[in-house]
Swiss-Prot record:
Start and end residues of each S4 RNA-binding domain: 89-157
Binding partners and assembly: Part of the 30S ribosomal subunit. Contacts protein S5. The interaction surface between S4 and S5 is involved in control of translational fidelity.
Principal localisation: plastid
Native source organism of the sequence: Lolium perenne (Perennial ryegrass)
Disulfide bonds: none
Spans annotated as Disordered: 16-36
Record function comment: One of the primary rRNA binding proteins, it binds directly to 16S rRNA where it nucleates assembly of the body of the 30S subunit. With S5 and S12 plays an important role in translational accuracy.
Family from the record: Belongs to the universal ribosomal protein uS4 family.
Localisation: Plastid, Chloroplast
BP GO annotations: ribosomal small subunit biogenesis; translation
Keywords in alphabetical order: Chloroplast, Plastid, Ribonucleoprotein, Ribosomal protein, RNA-binding, rRNA-binding
Name this polypeptide is given: Small ribosomal subunit protein uS4c
An annotated GO cellular component: small ribosomal subunit
Alphabetized GO MF terms: rRNA binding; structural constituent of ribosome
C-alpha cells in the first residue's frame, strides 16, 4: 500500500488531529468513534483507527509500519513503547518536532532534496534513525537555510519535547536522548496498534 497523498482534511475528520500530516484540526463531533456500533466489529474498528492514525501521522506505507512493528516486537521492552520510539526518532519526524518543517511530508521533502545534514554529512533518507548526540543542521547555503528560517523563528520553544534542543541562530538541532512516552507528538493508544497486528497473524 502506497503512502497517502489524498485530501488531508478528509483524514482528520475521520481520525482526529494528525499534526504530522497537517496543521489543520478537525471540528468537534467529526470523530469516527461516534459511528461505531457494539460488538466485535466495534473493537476491530477502534484498533484499525489507532493503526491508521499512526500511519497517516508519520506518513508511512502499510509495509513500513508493519516492519517497525516487527522490529519493536523483538525488543525486550514494551512493544508499543519501542514502536513509538522508533517512529519518533526518524529523521523526518525529528525535523518536524524541531520546528524545521511544518509537517512530516514537508520534512521529508527537505531530506529528499539534500538540504539536511546529520553530524556534518548529508542524509537523504527520511527514515534515517537518529540517536542521542546527533546534530541536525541545514546545508550552509542561503537556499537551505531560507527553507527553515521562517518556521524556526515562529516556533514555540515551550512546545519542544525534552529529548531535543534547538539553536535557532545556527539552524541546528540536537538529539539529547531517546524520548520518553509522554513526549510523543500524537494522541495515540499504541497498545491497540500492536494488538491490531497481532490479530492479523
Amino acid at each position: 500500500m502506497s503512502r497517502y497523498r489524498g485530501p488531508r482534511l478528509k483524514k482528520i475528520r475521520r481520525l482526529g488531529a494528525l499534526p504530522g500530516l497537517t496543521r489543520k484540526t478537525p471540528k468537534s463531533g467529526s470523530n469516527l468513534k461516534k459511528k461505531f456500533h457494539s460488538g466485535k466489529k466495534e473493537q476491530y474498528r477502534i484498533r484499525l483507527q489507532e493503526k491508521q492514525k499512526l500511519r497517516f501521522h508519520y506518513g508511512l506505507t502499510e509495509r513500513q509500519l508493519l516492519r517497525y512493528v516487527h522490529i519493536a516486537g523483538k525488543a525486550k521492552r514494551s512493544t508499543g513503547q519501542v514502536l513509538l520510539q522508533l517512529l519518533e526518532m526518524r529523521l523526518d519526524n525529528i525535523l518536524f518536532r524541531l520546528g524545521m518543517a511544518s509537517t512530516i511530508p514537508g520534512a521529508r521533502q527537505l531530506v529528499n532534496h539534500r538540504h539536511i545534514l546529520v553530524n556534518g554529512r548529508i542524509v537523504n533518507i527520511p527514515s534515517f534513525r537518529c540517536k542521542p548526540r546527533d546534530i541536525i543542521t541545514t546545508k550552509d547555503n542561503q537556499r537551505s537555510k531560507g527553507l527553515v528560517q521562517t518556521l524556526m523563528a515562529s516556533s514555540d520553544p515551550g512546545k519542544l519535547p525534552k529529548h531535543l534542543t534547538i539553536d535557532t541562530l545556527e539552524y541546528k538541532g540536537l538529539v539529547n536522548k531517546i524520548l520518553d512516552r509522554k513526549w510523543v507528538g500524537l494522541k495515540i493508544n499504541e497498545l491497540l496498534v500492536v494488538e491490531y497486528y497481532s490479530r492479523q497473524t
